[in-house]
Swiss-Prot record:
Origin: domain of life: Bacteria
Gene encoding the protein: bcsDI
Keyword entries, A-Z: Cellulose biosynthesis
Species of provenance: Komagataeibacter xylinus (Gluconacetobacter xylinus)
Taxonomic lineage: Bacteria, Pseudomonadati, Pseudomonadota, Alphaproteobacteria, Acetobacterales
GO biological process: cellulose biosynthetic process
Name of the protein this chain belongs to: Cellulose synthase operon protein D
Chain's role: May have a major role in the perfection of crystallization, involved either in the pore structure itself or in the organization of the pores within the linear array of terminal synthesizing complexes (TCs).
Kinase is among the record's keywords: no
Length: 156
């Protein structure tokens, strides 16, 4: 009997799992679940404390490289009191997600949320908005853009 030392490929399993989660639980529950998965991943793979955005970007790219999950560019938006996170090359689970190929994007929201709130000077009360950048609506976006910003207080 011949044995091969190939790494298992979970892509078929993940694609079928993504369809079942979407069908059984719905998009909102799926997104909440995947955000929690992202937070859990961030707890196991933490960057050191960083004093600058540039240093944090380098450390996050090193962590993303370890799991082959693309790379990130961080930008502070002073007027909006926000951080713009542009993630490139998110792994795809087939065509799952809206838009197609972005099923894992909520994982990034949880991952970056936990990574960023662990840094000096970060605030814990934040909201995340996500957008995807696609030149052609029929193509798979190459970027996932996340804005991390302080929650506005209702009391003024």
């Amino acid at each position: 009997m011949t044995t091969f030392n190939a790494k298992p490929d979970f892509s078929l399993f993940l694609q079928a799992l993504s369809w079942e989660i979407d069908d059984q639980a719905g998009i909102e529950v799926r997104n909440d679940l995947l955000r929690e998965v992202g937070r859990g991943m961030a707890g196991r793979l933490q960057p050191p404390l960083c004093n600058t955005i540039h240093q944090l970007q380098i450390e996050l790219n090193a962590l993303l490289g370890m799991i082959n999950w693309g790379y990130v560019k961080l930008e502070l938006l002073a007027e909006e009191q926000a951080m713009r996170i542009v993630h490139e090359d998110l792994p795809q689970v087939g065509s799952a997600g809206e838009p197609s190929g972005t099923w894992l994007a909520p994982v990034l929201e949880g991952l970056y949320g936990r990574w960023i709130t662990s840094q000096p000077g970060a605030f814990g009360d934040y909201v995340v908005t996500r957008d995807v950048d696609a030149e052609d609506l029929n193509s798979v976006p190459t970027q996932t853009i996340i804005l991390y910003m302080r929650t506005r207080s209702n009391s003024n």
